[in-house]
Amino acid sequence: MIECLLYRNSTAQRRLFYRVEIAMNLFSEVSVMREWGLAGGRPKAVVQCFSNLRDASRAADRHRNRAERRGYLRA
């Protein structure tokens, strides 16, 4: 399992997070799981499945780069 956790402080009261995780699933596929939301709140999540690690890693990097461009910083 590979994980990247990012945070963004938009105001003093709102601490946002964005998490990207790469893991193998039970069907020998590689999953990219993304979660985002308010810290301490209920997160939203999306899971994408890929046939190989290279494609999953590229997708995870795209999502992480997009989050960093939007102001999220590594934890």
What are these model-predicted stretches?
Residues 7-11, 36-37, 67-70:
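A broad, low-specificity signal for short, low-complexity segments enriched in glycine/proline
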Residues 1-14, 40-41, 51-53:
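Negatively charged, low-complexity tracts enriched in Asp/Glu with abundant Ser/Thr
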Residues 3, 13-14, 23, 46, ...:
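A general marker of short, structured functional hotspots
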Residues 1-2, 73-75:
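Intrinsically disordered, low-complexity and often Lys/Arg-enriched segments
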Residues 42-44, 51-69:
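A short, charged, amphipathic alpha-helix used as a generic interaction element across diverse proteins
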Residues 17:
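Beta-strand residues that line the small-molecule/cofactor-binding core
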Residues 20-46, 61-62, 73:
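Short aromatic-glycine-(Arg/Gly/Cys) micro-motifs in beta-strand/loop hairpins
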